[in-house]
């Protein structure tokens, strides 16, 4: 029988303590909370309490529970009280889910065709596996200048990597060797013209205290893999 082992590193008392702490968070605490942590909580709670349920229900053409979107609605009320912009991605993401939930509650279908994946052609498949199979761990670099546009494109690939619980902790620092010569001296990889440093904003992980520590490695690794594949592709 399948058993989720992700919480095995915590005792039952520790699990209950985390659960009780999360459930006891007041509106006052959420309003006073660091903005980065609050936004991460909106992403995580919208994902776990509404997004999963909306997609599962829409796929099966079923009705959603009338109160399923209540907590996400409340988070957006707090969002507005904090004076955060409605154009920010978290607000637009949660608003879309709420709109979809309201349709599902009434038994209406939700049109998800705008998000339908692009059909993969035979040539696209071939190109993809060419990138995957021909990527190499580079040990020597030229001093060729790398334009910002290329760096942005590579980092964009990292942003689209899978991330546990949708807390989106990944951050980047771009260091040009000419601006900080020798900063990475001593690394096992020889220096190049540009260094891309993958960081994590640990405030985001407070949004879901149940997240295993190992997720931090998986989240950074997923971003890193996307980046090296994109670097090879461009």
What are these regions (language model features)?
Residues 1-234:
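Acidic, surface-exposed loops and disordered segments
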